[in-house]
Amino acid sequence: MRHFAPIASILLSGLVPSALAAGDHPRVHFETDKGEIVIELDKALAPKTVENFLSYVDSGFYEGTIFHRVIKGFMIQGGGLTGNMQQKKTNAPVVNEADNGLKNLRGTIAMARTQEPNSATSQFFINTVDNQFLDFKSKTPGGWGYCVFGKVVEGMETVDAIENLPTTSKGMYSDVPATPVAIRRAFVETGDS
């Protein structure tokens, strides 16, 4: 029995680094009308943003929201409006962590916001091309940029399919997919997912 403790310790020590790594890089699945998108988040470089995003995922907030802004050769945006173009009530804004070193490259996910740098709440966008002009440059109103907090690791073909949809205007919104694309389900990947 006294040999069991060292063996168990060795076996468990092999599990700890992978558990910690998964903790720093949780994966979120979006099941959409066009297919699945899996996003790996970077909790180490964007801790407050990831915590904010996961709070929306865990609460079921994103389910039933649509990708309401789609611009070919730029990005797809979602996470705040229902299918009838109604804004959902959000939590308080999150501090802008765009100075974290992550870049707005194709396949990355970033927080959408107003002109106020620290105004991001639930809305996000996925870059469909490299958008360096959205990167952090300085802590000034014009230089803050948009906080990248993860990347698509599966389902970029779904992102591309959404990007290529015909768009129209609906009320005060332009670049809205003519056929709505909803997030049916959003969840954090677990060992059972």
Report the location of each language-model feature.
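Positively charged n-region of N-terminal signal peptides that target proteins for export
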Residues: 1-4
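Bacterial N-terminal signal peptides
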Residues: 6-17
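Cyclophilin-like peptidyl-prolyl cis-trans isomerases
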Residues: 18-193
